[in-house]
A protein has these predicted regions:
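Active-site-proximal loop/helix of nucleotide/amide-processing enzymes and allied scaffolds
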Residues: 1-15, 31, 54-56, 71-147
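Glycine-rich, small/polar surface segments that engage phosphate groups of diverse ligands
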Residues: 19-78, 83
Length: 147
């Protein structure tokens, strides 16, 4: 007799860290993201993070989605949404850095944001913002009307 084994995914949840941190503005989100970006690599390598929030906009968790070269990073929408579903997030805020120091969103930044927004809407998860960080400043897509 032959059995097919199906791998099991196990989720573990622990309330610690930023779990009571309320994110009510782009500035609040940037403050949380800056705690997780590597300051020594902010001007060297591009990284992409997702911040997951509950219905009260309290932090459920943060996840590094990718880290790559000096001018781009690979972002898989499925990975962002998978984590949102696993932690029962009601909202997501994205952030990535521009090692160049330029805060202007690229065409690719706008395109991936729209892809993530479409996926999040389908899953009834709100994409609240996408922030671009540099070592000296930040830009909020929501504040600039890009969302």
């Amino acid at each position: 007799m032959k059995f097919n084994i199906v791998n099991e995914i196990k989720l573990s949840y622990s309330r610690k860290g930023n779990s009571e941190r309320l994110v009510g503005s782009s500035r609040d989100a940037v403050d949380v993201f800056r705690q997780h970006f590597d300051r020594d690599e902010m001007d060297y390598r591009e990284s992409f993070f997702a911040l997951y929030l509950n219905q009260a906009h309290k932090v459920l968790g943060i996840r590094k989605i990718s880290e790559s070269g000096i001018s781009s990073t690979v972002v898989d929408v499925r990975i962002i949404m998978q984590a949102a579903l696993l932690c029962n997030a009601s909202a997501v805020i994205l952030a990535h850095n521009h090692p160049s120091g330029n805060l202007k969103p690229s065409a690719e930044d706008l395109k991936i944001t729209q892809s993530i927004k479409s996926a999040s809407e389908f899953l009834n998860i709100k994409l609240l913002d996408h922030c671009i960080l540099t070592s000296t400043g930040h830009l909020s897509f929501a504040d600039q009307g890009h969302l």
